[in-house]
């Protein structure tokens, strides 16, 4: 199986990008298939058009590729800054457009118009979230969004949150150590 690594940060000089790039490079050097989803680099449009919502599927090539890669991967790694106690808008748009029926879950209707039964499709996947915060903030809202909402709905049970807090208060050595430990944990957990 493959590893899907999603990055939601516009700055290629950011710590988020460094973790994204180094994690992917280590996994690729090991011979793993790595799907890189750099949302800003790919110019992903997070806004779901009305026709896509009504059609319940997307014709956007990024959405199709991202959904296929998510399905092919045994480990999903999402890397993002913590902005206002949550992920950036581009990443919320990724969830809205990718986590649809047929990719993250299926719906079964016994009769037209009845409430559907939801079947999770990601239950065999491992998920790692890497969030970086400038201040010392709680991880509670990130866990509530990612673990308890998005991935619980899709059946994921193997979930880990790596949350670097108070970047402003850390020196370069502390940040470097945290980055090295994060990349090590992400690449060790993949095997």
Positions of predicted regions on the chain:
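Active-site donor-binding loop signature of nucleotide-sugar glycosyltransferases
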Residues: 39, 132, 164-166
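Conserved active-site beta-strand-loop modules that form the wall/rim of enzyme catalytic pockets
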Residues: 75, 128, 159
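A generic structural signal for alpha->beta connector loops
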Residues: 31-33, 124, 156-158
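N-terminal beta1-alpha1-beta2 submodule of the flavodoxin-like/Rossmannoid cofactor-binding fold
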Residues: 1-104, 169-191
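Short, glycine-/small-residue-rich phosphate/pyrophosphate-handling segment
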Residues: 107-154
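Glycine-rich phosphate/pyrophosphate-binding loop and the adjoining helix
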Residues: 138-191
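Short beta-strands and strand-loop turn motifs
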Residues: 6-7, 130-132, 162
């Amino acid at each position: 199986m493959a590893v899907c690594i999603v990055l939601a940060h516009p700055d290629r000089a950011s710590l988020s990008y460094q973790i994204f790039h180094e994690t992917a490079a280590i996994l690729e050097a090991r011979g793993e298939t790595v799907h890189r989803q750099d949302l800003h680099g790919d110019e992903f449009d997070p806004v779901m058009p009305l026709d896509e919502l009504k059609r319940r599927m997307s014709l956007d090539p990024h959405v199709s590729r991202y959904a296929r890669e998510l399905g092919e991967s045994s480990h999903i790694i999402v890397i993002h800054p913590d902005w206002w106690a949550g992920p950036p808008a581009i990443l919320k748009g990724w969830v809205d457009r990718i986590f649809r029926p047929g990719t993250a879950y299926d719906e079964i209707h016994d009769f037209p118009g009845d409430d559907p039964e939801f079947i999770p499709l990601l239950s065999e996947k491992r998920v790692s979230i890497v969030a970086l915060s400038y201040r010392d903030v709680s991880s509670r809202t990130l866990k509530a969004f990612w673990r308890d909402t998005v991935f619980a709905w899709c059946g994921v049970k193997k979930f880990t949150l790596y949350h670097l807090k108070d970047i402003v208060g850390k020196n370069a050595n502390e940040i470097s150590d945290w980055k090295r430990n994060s990349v090590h944990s992400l690449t060790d957990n993949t095997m």
